[in-house]
């Protein structure tokens, strides 16, 4: 799988996971409708299915995906929660993305 396709798949996967966790959070902490649990469950099912689309070892995918998840979570903090990330949030996200790139795109023996 190409680098761009892998990154796109990681981004969509992270959004599905974050949405699947954010909706129950709204229900539990802000008194929103219990019906939010339905799209949350569907989002988490989508998340699990998306993880299965990666053609490499599952452990490597999960480790690399964590870097993208950190980046998307900080982006969510800014765009959805309305909290501007600190310099250290941004630095940490970049470090996580560098780790993801090393894990996913390093040369491997066939």
UniProtKB/Swiss-Prot annotation:
UniProt KW Cell membrane keyword: yes
Pfam families reported for this sequence: UPF0060
Matching InterPro entries: UPF0060
Compartmental location: Cell inner membrane
GO annotations of cellular component type: plasma membrane
Residue intervals passing through the bilayer: 8-28, 33-53, 63-83, 87-107
Keywords: Cell inner membrane, Cell membrane, Membrane, Transmembrane, Transmembrane helix
Keyword Ribosomal protein: no
Membrane topology field: Multi-pass membrane protein
Family: Belongs to the UPF0060 family.
Protein name: UPF0060 membrane protein AHA_2410
């Amino acid at each position: 799988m190409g680098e761009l396709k892998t990154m796109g798949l990681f981004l969509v996967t992270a959004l599905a996971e974050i949405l699947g966790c954010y909706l129950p959070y709204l229900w539990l902490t802000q008194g929103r409708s219990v019906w939010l649990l339905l799209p949350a469950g569907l989002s988490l099912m989508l998340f699990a299915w998306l993880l299965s689309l990666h053609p490499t070892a599952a452990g490597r995918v999960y480790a690399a995906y964590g870097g993208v998840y950190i980046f998307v979570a900080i982006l969510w903090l800014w765009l959805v929660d309305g909290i501007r990330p600190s310099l250290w949030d941004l630095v940490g996200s970049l470090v996580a993305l560098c780790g993801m790139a090393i894990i996913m795109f390093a040369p491997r023996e066939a």
